Amino acid sequence: MKDTSLPSTAGVVNKLIDSLGKLPGIGPKSAQRLAFYLMRAPEDQVISLSDTIRNIKNQISQCRICCNVADSELCPICQNTKRETNKICVVEQPQDILALEHVGVYRGYYHVLHGAISPTEGITSQNIRINELMVRLDNGQVEEIILATNPTTEGEATAMYLSRLITPLGIKVTRLARGLPFGTELEYADDVTLSRAMEGRQNF
């Protein structure tokens, strides 16, 4: 990683710049701007931010049903009894739910795998939340599984694996339409593309 420290800046500021620069999507210049913004910001705002970051580690866990992030036993989506109980959309990461919810065309529930099958990285089906998904299918309420894993080599491998597991159960398995460019992560797709991919999903 490129050194973001500034020789003319106090050590504690350089430490902050370095820490911010380790965040995804934050380059050296952005890290410096954020650091100096925090220096100028009101103390209560900085303390509130610090407390919130600390609470993420202390208070956030996983929903016992869908494995989404939650600050109680169930995430807000699983608490919502007005959603369609016969559909589950399977995604790789919690941020994929945010992207799909922002589009607003899907009203079923979700399941978060927290990863994708990747033999090159040593990630197998046992390392992601597939067993938890299969348990959810035992109640006979689910009629459709929507595979919304990323259009990557790992995402496709995971989708194929899940399809082979679920199809024999008599549950309809669909995949997001091919509007997403290969190699794209779901969270970075624009709303129009995601909407078309969800509405045009195909049997898989």
Swiss-Prot record:
GO BP of this protein: DNA recombination; DNA repair
Keyword terms of this UniProt record: DNA damage, DNA recombination, DNA repair, Metal-binding, Zinc, Zinc-finger
Domain of life where this protein originates: Bacteria
N-terminal signal peptide: none
Zinc finger region(s), C4-type: 63-78
GO MF: DNA binding; zinc ion binding
Keyword field contains Transmembrane: no
Domain Toprim, residue spans: 86-181
Pfam assignment, any one: RecR_C
Described purpose of this protein according to its UniProt entry: May play a role in DNA repair. It seems to be involved in an RecBC-independent recombinational process of DNA repair. It may act with RecF and RecO.
Family designation: Belongs to the RecR family.
Protein name: Recombination protein RecR
Organism lineage: Bacteria, Bacillati, Chloroflexota, Dehalococcoidia, Dehalococcoidales
